[in-house]
Amino acid sequence: MTLTKSMMYKAIRNKKIKVNRKRCTYDQKLQEGDSILLFLPYEFLETRQKACPVNTGSIDVVYEDDDIVLVNKPAGLLSQSDEKGLQDTLVNRIQYYLYQKKEYDPQRENSFAPAICHRLDKNTSGLILAAKNARALRLMNDAISCHKVRKVYCAKIEGTPLWDTKEVLCYIKKQETKALVAAEAKPGYKEAHMHVKVLKRQKEYSIVQIFLETGRFHQIRASMAYLGYPLCGDIKYGYKGSRKSYSLCAYHLEIGDVDLPIANKDFTIPISF
C-alpha cells in the first residue's frame, strides 16, 4: 500500500506515525531494525491507483441533479459486482457515465466513487438511486433507514387471486440461494410484511402492485409463491410454465424529506409486461 506525501506529512504532524514507539520527525532517517507504527484510518491508504471506468453499456437516466442520479436498471444486469468480480454492473455503468461528463475522476486524490444507495436483484428491473458524492450517499442512506424513501413494485403472477388487496405477514429464512417461508415465527426466521393489490386480471395471470414494509431476501418472490401465485417465469419458486426471466419491476419511487434537491419528488416508469 502507498501513502501520498501530503497524507504522510499530515500524519506525522498529528502524531499518527511513530518510530520505535516515539513520535517521528519530517527529516528522521530510519535505521535497520526500526519499528514503524501507523495509526491511520483505512481510507488514508491506497491499495492501488483507481482505474478509469470502461464503457460496458448505457444507462437509462430518469432524473439527475448535482447530488443524485436516478436510473432505470434493466433486468439481467447486476446492481453491483458480486464475488465473481464481474465488470458489467449498474455501478460501473453509472461511474463511466459520470466520468464521461467529467463529474468523476477516479485518479484525483481522495475522489469519491459514485455509488448506489440501494440495490435490486439481477433479474429485477426498476428504479435505483445513486449518489455522486459522500454527503448525498450518507443523507440518502439515512433517509432509506428512516423509511423516508418508498419503493413500490409491480409483478406479473401466475393465476388470478379472488381478493383485490391483501396484507401478507409471514416469516422468511435465507437458505443458500433460496428463501424458506413459514406462517409462524420460528428460530432463524425473520418477519416479512408486505401489501399486495391486484391491478389487472387475465385468464391465466394477473398484474399486482406490491409495497414492502420489510426487505427480506427474495421476499416478493417467496411470499407470492407461498400464497400460491408465483411470479411468471420464476421456476425457482414454483412457476410451472416455460423457463424465462421472472417479471418484477420497482416501478414507483417516492422521496420524502431529505436535505437534497430530490426531496419530496415522486417518480414512475412504465411497465413492459
Describe each region flagged by the PLM.
Residues 1-273:
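RNA pseudouridine synthases
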